[in-house]
Amino acid sequence: MTSISQRAPLLVPRSLVTQLMALYDYPHPLQRGRIIRGYDRSHAARTARMCAAVATALGHGAERVRQYQIACLLHDLGRAGLDRQLFGKIWSWAKERAIPTRPLEWRAIHQDTPYGRETEAFLRCYRKDLEAHGIAMTAWAKEQVEMRLGYSRRLARRLRTVRPAIKKMGVTWAPWMQQVMLYYYYPEKLASAKPWVRQLAEILVACEQFEAYSNQRRGRDYYVRKKETLVDAFAYLETLQQEGILSGPVMGTLRRLTAQGEFDAILEEARGCAFTRGERRALRAMES
């Protein structure tokens, strides 16, 4: 039997993981000499472990999965510099008012928004309201908006900055690695992607959202949530499947591995506490 420590492992050396995680560190634009430490690096590591396990179970080759896990480790790079307090204020305010947080959802409501200009449209619509709420919409605050509604361009900027460092690490960066990182916010960008790229992108969305919905810290800071439940996690994934973002094979494999206990230790770490007996029974029945 596979031991807990060997389940859903990191496939790249710890030394490389440490180097990659350092790419999330960001110089504070308002306080010279201060570095904003990458937010929730452990979320990225847990997500990457889950992604590699699902990709392997779906038959992707070892070298591709290793390269994929590197992309998954960096999937939040477009949010390097996330200011927990400011980001939380802006997006909790938006959530209370049911304001879309993904570009596709924004354009569905605001159909006159030019593609790629969702951040600017958000600011035009809500700047005065946010400032009346006590949130000054400085250039730094605008970046916190861009981390969601302009994720593609912010990720591209950050990748341009760190690409030389990635190369020095001996990592070969392929275009598909950036593509899979964008799928949750920009599914349309993978409309003509190869099936295997699309599947890896789906896996990242499924695992990242599953971990995020189990993540106590992220729930408090990012989703304005006070409690983590497995029911909520899979309910959201099922919504994404109904929307065509996730496919049956990806969801089925995630359920099977979850039922087999592949992710128990990862999810308990994310929650900050052990599962109850009832929760563990629910996990074991996840495939049925």
Predicted regions and their residues:
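Histidine- and acidic-residue-rich, metal-dependent catalytic cores
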Residues: 4-288
